[in-house]
């Protein structure tokens, strides 16, 4: 069975459309491979991360930005003083792709010691 490390070790593949989004069952199976807290709704996955202060929140945001740049797959992020909500979807196909789960796993790895 694939786990978070397997997903985090993968690289995103360019997606410019022309392929169908993941079926709900496929997305649910990939969701099980992520850390707890990720939610599947409305053709996207999201998770809210909490921190002690603004500095830690912004350090996390910058780390997510680095991952996104490396993978060329970018989430929507809503940032507050001590929270950051990260949402992934693949806009080019109007739904979820494996890239969304790969990046979510990489984000999870940022916080695993």
UniProtKB/Swiss-Prot annotation:
GO terms for molecular function: 4-alpha-hydroxytetrahydrobiopterin dehydratase activity. It comes from the Bacteria. Its EC number is 4.2.1.96. SUPFAM superfamilies: PCD-like. It catalyses: (4aS,6R)-4a-hydroxy-L-erythro-5,6,7,8-tetrahydrobiopterin = (6R)-L-erythro-6,7-dihydrobiopterin + H2O. GO terms for biological process: tetrahydrobiopterin biosynthetic process. Keywords: Lyase. InterPro entries: PCD_sf (IPR036428), Pterin_deHydtase (IPR001533). The keyword Lyase applies. It is an enzyme of class 4 (lyase). Belongs to the pterin-4-alpha-carbinolamine dehydratase family. This is Putative pterin-4-alpha-carbinolamine dehydratase.
